[in-house]
Amino acid sequence: MYIKRTVEKSILEAAKSFPCIVLYGPRQVGKSTTLDYVFPANFNRVTLDDTEDRELAEKNPKLFLEVNPWPIIIDEIQKVPALLDAIKIKIDEQRKIWLKNNEERKLMYVLIGSNRFELQQGISETLAGRCGIIEMSSFTLREKKAMEAHLFTPKIEVLIQRSQQEKSEYLTRTQIFEEIYKGGMPDICTNVSERNIYYKSYVNT
């Protein structure tokens, strides 16, 4: 069962503004699952966890992008930093074509990564101004409870109104501690894995 994520809205907004999106966050928080839900099946998908794909990307980034044309979702992008330069060239070439033909620009690349610091360095040096960067975390309480996510506001009257509307959804102190103890990793929240075994394995790997 797919649980709707708050970050979906940010992803769709970035898709309208940039030819490239970078979605990063810890392992197993649902990045690939969310993108599979948000983007249609006509997006190619490849992961650099795959040995053959990774070797091709390392040896010949240009050929890799020709074999795997856009629109494409590339997972574990931080494993092949050299691919960012090839993506930059592809984006710049396509931008010229769109400009010449007076065409609306499209989303070309969606890059997924789990190492924030390696990603930020490569992106700031190579893809600055060409991509929207979005961070994704594990489930929030609102996501787990299917509650509407509101933008922050300092207006007291709005906060009071929201408080009144959500009284029926308040948790008891015991429930709050249970939610903190359980955490927000998707495999636990969807009862795929047992908590203690899951976190022990997660930390050890």
Predicted feature locations:
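N-terminal pre-Walker A segment at the start of P-loop NTPase domains
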Residues: 1-15
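Hydrophobic anchor at the beta1->P-loop junction of P-loop NTPases
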Residues: 23
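Conserved lysine of the Walker
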Residues: 31-32
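Post-Walker A alpha-helix
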Residues: 35-36
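Short glycine-rich substrate-engagement loop in P-loop NTPases that contacts/grips substrate
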Residues: 43-71
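Conserved catalytic/switch belt of AAA+ P-loop NTPases
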Residues: 84-111, 115, 124-125
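Short regulatory helix/loop adjacent to the ATP-binding pocket of P-loop NTPases
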Residues: 117-132, 145-150
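Interdomain hinge/linker elements that couple catalytic modules in large macromolecular machines
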Residues: 141-142, 146-205
